[in-house]
């Protein structure tokens, strides 16, 4: 059980890191990216992006919103 938990925690950390790096590139600021990751987001059903990164599906939703922001599209 402990190995599964540590593998899950590692996967969560990796997803958060990847999405945060994407946000940093888009916002061109570490502080702005972290702020965005920690705030409720209407486009994500008022969820905090960082909380959605606990699953692959949630991280994909966050990436889609970031991509829309990057390309100036509505979400």
Task: Please report, for each region that a protein language model flagged, where it lies by residue.
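Non-transmembrane "mature" sequence context
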Residues: 1-75
């Amino acid at each position: 059980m402990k190995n599964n938990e540590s593998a899950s925690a590692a996967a969560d950390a990796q997803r958060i890191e990847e999405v945060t790096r994407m946000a940093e590139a888009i916002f061109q600021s570490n502080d702005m990216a972290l702020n965005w990751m920690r705030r409720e987001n209407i486009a994500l059903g008022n969820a905090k992006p960082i909380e959605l990164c606990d699953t692959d599906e949630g991280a994909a939703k966050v990436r889609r919103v970031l991509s829309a922001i990057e390309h100036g599209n509505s979400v």
